[in-house]
Structure formats: C-alpha cells, structure tokens
UniProtKB/Swiss-Prot annotation:
<comment type="similarity">
    <text>Belongs to the bacterial ribosomal protein bL19 family.</text>
</comment>
<dbReference type="InterPro" id="IPR001857">
    <property type="entry name" value="Ribosomal_bL19"/>
</dbReference>
<dbReference type="Pfam" id="PF01245">
    <property type="entry name" value="Ribosomal_L19"/>
</dbReference>
<keyword id="KW-0687">Ribonucleoprotein</keyword>
<dbReference type="InterPro" id="IPR008991">
    <property type="entry name" value="Translation_prot_SH3-like_sf"/>
</dbReference>
<dbReference type="GO" id="GO:0003735">
    <property type="term" value="F:structural constituent of ribosome"/>
</dbReference>
<keyword id="KW-0689">Ribosomal protein</keyword>
<dbReference type="GO" id="GO:0022625">
    <property type="term" value="C:cytosolic large ribosomal subunit"/>
</dbReference>
<dbReference type="InterPro" id="IPR038657">
    <property type="entry name" value="Ribosomal_bL19_sf"/>
</dbReference>
<protein>
    <recommendedName>
        <fullName>Large ribosomal subunit protein bL19</fullName>
    </recommendedName>
</protein>
<dbReference type="InterPro" id="IPR018257">
    <property type="entry name" value="Ribosomal_bL19_CS"/>
</dbReference>
<dbReference type="GO" id="GO:0006412">
    <property type="term" value="P:translation"/>
</dbReference>
<comment type="function">
    <text>This protein is located at the 30S-50S ribosomal subunit interface and may play a role in the structure and function of the aminoacyl-tRNA binding site.</text>
</comment>
Length: 126
C-alpha cells in the first residue's frame, strides 16, 4: 500500500472516530443528520431522501440524496467523511439494478417510486 493510501486511511479513522457509518447503496432511503451553524447557534438538521448516486473514492467519497420538498425536487451532495455530517440512518432499502439513478430526475409521481428490497432471513448452519 502506498503512503498516500495509508495517510487517507488514518484520516478516515480520525474523522469517523466513534461514529459508525451504515452500509447503504443507491435506491436506499436515508436520513442524513447535518450540523448547521446559524450565527452562534449550532443545531442538527435532518435531510431525508433517496440516494441516487454513491461515489467511493476513499477520503473523497460522496453521495447524492434527492428529495421532494413542497413539490420541488432538491438534490444535495454530501461528503461521506465530512465533519458536518452528524449521522446517517437507513430508513428503507431500495431494490434497483443501476449504480446511478439519474433517470429519476426526469420522472415524477408513481413512476419515480423504488421497489423495496425484502430482507430474507439467514439459515442457521449448526
């Protein structure tokens, strides 16, 4: 492993600290808790939507969340290891066959729905 990769891994460990990042994929509905600073006040704002893209690039990993807010579609890009992210919670798993769901931008209503992935129980091997 080269020196830059080692430094990136150390920085990821330092930034995550005690936070645990859940595994999520495009199509999943997530709630991203974002630290917002307004003047001197600091609060946590929840941003819920569908992950339409995920970019795995080590320390530079990011993902795009799309939500419909009062009839308007809003997309926001988050850096995965950003200190502004307080936490990520997966609400539901989506069953999709694409890595990038950019086609959802041209759809609205029922055609923009994503099928839910049903979780199967693991068989016990004893």
């Amino acid at each position: 492993m080269n020196l830059i990769a080692v430094l990136e891994q150390e920085e990821i460990k330092r930034l995550t600290g005690d936070k645990t990042m859940p595994e999520f994929a495009p199509g999943d509905t997530v709630v991203v808790s974002v630290n917002v600073v307004e003047g001197t006040r600091k609060r946590v704002q929840a941003y819920e939507g569908v992950v339409i893209a995920k970019r795995n690039r080590g320390l530079n990993s990011s993902f795009i969340v799309r939500k419909i807010s009062s009839g308007e579609a809003v997309e926001r890009t988050f850096q995965l290891y950003s200190p502004q992210i307080a936490g990520i919670e997966v609400k539901r798993r989506g069953d999709v066959r694409r890595a990038k769901l950019y086609y959802l931008r041209s759809r609205s209503g029922k055609s923009a729905r994503i099928k839910e992935k049903l979780v199967t129980k693991q068989a016990k091997s004893a």
